[in-house]
UniProtKB/Swiss-Prot annotation:
Secreted among keywords: no
One annotated GO molecular function: DNA-binding transcription factor activity
Keyword Transcription assigned: yes
Protein name: HTH-type transcriptional repressor BdcR
Annotated S-S bridges: none
SUPFAM superfamilies in the record: Homeodomain-like, Tetracyclin repressor-like, C-terminal domain
Function: Negatively regulates expression of bdcA.
Swiss-Prot/TrEMBL keywords: DNA-binding, Repressor, Transcription, Transcription regulation
UniProt cross-references to Pfam families, sorted A to Z: TetR_N
Origin organism lineage: Bacteria, Pseudomonadati, Pseudomonadota, Gammaproteobacteria, Enterobacterales
DNA-binding region positions on the chain: 38-57
Domain spans labelled HTH tetR-type: 15-75
Species, as recorded: Escherichia coli (strain K12)
PROSITE patterns in alphabetical order: HTH_TETR_1, HTH_TETR_2
Top-level taxon of origin: Bacteria
Amino acid sequence: MVTKKQSRVPGRPRRFAPEQAISAAKVLFHQKGFDAVSVAEVTDYLGINPPSLYAAFGSKAGLFSRVLNEYVGTEAIPLADILRDDRPVGECLVEVLKEAARRYSQNGGCAGCMVLEGIHSHDPQARDIAVQYYHAAETTIYDYIARRHPQRAQCVTDFMSTVMSGLSAKAREGHSIEQLCATAAMAGEAIKTILEE
């Protein structure tokens, strides 16, 4: 008995949609981190071949850059909305930390902050991309504090960065939203004391 090998029906090749690839890759990079994800894993996950990836994004780091851009645009803490000049500085900074705790807590298998985790990448290009976003957020926080507390701006910004990095790390370790919010609240009290508000 001879069995016929089923051949694929000819037709148009599957279309590659870069925007859908970015959204899908965002989950992968967020769950595992840039360094832990191989090009083969990315292409398999996206259902494309390596040449398609390179044609669309140039490299894995190029894809990561686009992913971070989308992440910052859709999932980052809305600093511009929270850091308001009509409210006490300490109160707004506490809200930033609480929002970080909420956003960094486990969400569909993606915990922590992709930017904060990205700055630890061993790949120089990926790390530089993440550092740009990190510095932009730090500068926004620093400038906000400096408008009313110029002499405390650097130390409070450093403290905020340290606490947010810790919240991200603890979220990735599996800390609950309640634990993260409690830490954010304690850190917020310290900030209010430092600013004497």
